[in-house]
Amino acid sequence: MKFIKFNDSTIDSFLFMMLTDLAKTLTKSEAVEVEYGVQSYYNPFEKKIYMSHFWKDRAAEDMEAGLKSDVYLRSVGTRYSSLHEFANFLNDIHRHLTFKSFAKQLFMLLEDIRIEECIKRERPGTKHVFAKRKDMYRKHFSTQLTLNLERSIFTDALFCAIYFKLTAESPLETLPSMREDIDLMRPFIEQQLLRVYEADSTRQVLKIVEDLMDGLEEVLDKDMLNTYFFLPELDYAKAAEQPLFEEEKKAPKLSDDITLPKQSDGDEDIHEEEMPTWHRETEAPSKSFLQFDIEHGAKSDLGKDASREGDDGDQALGSVQGSARQTKRKDYSKLEALESQKDQPNGAGMADGKENKYAFPIYKEPQPATSEEELSYKQQAKTIESYQKRLKQMIQKTLEHKKTLPRTDLHAGRLNNKLLRYFTERNPRLFYKKQEPSSEIDAVFTLLVDCSASMFDKMDETKRGIVLFHEALKSVAVPHQIVGFWEDTNDATEKSQPNYFNTVIPFQSSLRQDSGPAIMQLEPEEDNRDGYAIRQMTKKMLHRSEAQKFLIVFSDGEPAAFGYEQNGIVDTSEAVIEARKRGIEVINVFLSNSEIEESQMKTIQDMYGKFSIFVPDVDQLPDVLYPLLKKLLHKSIG
């Protein structure tokens, strides 16, 4: 069970999502992702921008500026670089140079400085970000220069001095004295560095590095010890042949996110219909026959390799290669021409977030309650009986008060015909209300309970709080469901992640007098995929007609599942935001058996915002839940 960590620090998920959106916007590609790494660079094959951990442990403003500068350099700046020259440079250093690390870092430093100037010309609003970046780097390299000189690490010291010279405000600033043979090279080095700000292409930067290395190969005795800038060893020649940020073949998005309710089994009736290749949505004619875009409809269960997007070179009369063979009776299972069925993931794809692409739900029905569970439930219900009665009385009094409220002479409502009071009274009451207030609470609740293994020492008291919710909501006739969720660790694979949902109290039976003992069936299980569970409950609640919808998540705040550790907090935060956009209020109840650390509180607030309730002593859970439930029910009455 882990929080997402950024070099042993908890990540601000809102900042991470902001940087992700920034990268996607600047690259104009949904395929691009961002991730934290040791050094900053762009991987064109993964379509991933890596941001350096160098910016950690700084003031929030400085950290944000540093991370943004990495995103600017890799998303906007990479377009100014030539990947062909990157490939040529890597080939040259492996064949001719001795000090490869120094050459690669020098190349990336000079190229970053060049593309930084290009970005500032294209987007002047980035100047303050790069100014902060330069200030932080100059402080860092000042310390590193002193340290390297004291330890006689002259290659690293020379690199730090080169950075200082390149970013100096005054042209009079010179390279410091190091070693006699290096000092003799100082005029030559400074002369070459003057060419950097005149370079307008990657090729010219490469030429400067080659000229510098020709001279420095004779005076340097060791390669660099530290890594300040990073050039990954990738197949840049191949990367240059494909789109830089976009996917090579990208299917158009549907106008609505609809999934077919039933998968096809191959026995459906097939109706042949003519479909014209031109229609009113066609913007421009094309030379290709039978080429069109589908923008409306539902997602099918076709295999991902069963079709491809058409190319302009495709022709209507192209030949098709197939094969046939004699079969026994009607057994066609061994025909070579038929494509063998591939193992397809059971998940719903990207509809539930990219981190849950291969997750799929398994809903469990509650078992009939045993005598032990019924006895345990009665004991729990007795402990919260006073809370439940107080809530019921409060709700009944509030509803009765609304009924007896005057329906005329109000400050808001329908305008009556007694308008003279507008001129004769200082605070006139000119409105009335026609309809009678409803005697029912127009609200619905879902209680989502984390059943991961980390809840083993909190589950008993959690059940007690859930019993309070259930009895209170049942007494005032508010429909609700109680669902425990977990992921099966043993059966989870890279392309199949079963997630179990144990609906111990469904909506349809939540108000029955005998409902409740099934709550005792909630037990700590294995892992938890919080973001996926919230999305599944959101779908179910959207089918409800009640005006107020509340989703209460009981957890210990540690989302962790197969392949979910790195981005679990970000995915959960995205799921919460999506639910709130659809009118569902999501509230987290954080459970603990000890004092809650500030880092834990920050992490929970990153996921759920200000709608987080912290319970440092789980034994006091009913005392915490009572005012919450009171407030939510009072809000539902309006």
Swiss-Prot record:
The keyword Signal applies. Keywords: Signal. Residues 247-256, 273-284, 301-310, 329-342 have a biased composition (Basic and acidic residues). Residues 247-285, 301-354 are annotated as: Disordered. InterPro entries: NorD/CobT, VWF_A, vWFA_dom_sf. Residues 445-632 form the VWFA domain. Pfam families: VWA. SMART domains: VWA. Residues 1-31 form the signal peptide. This is Uncharacterized protein YojO. It comes from Bacillus subtilis (strain 168).
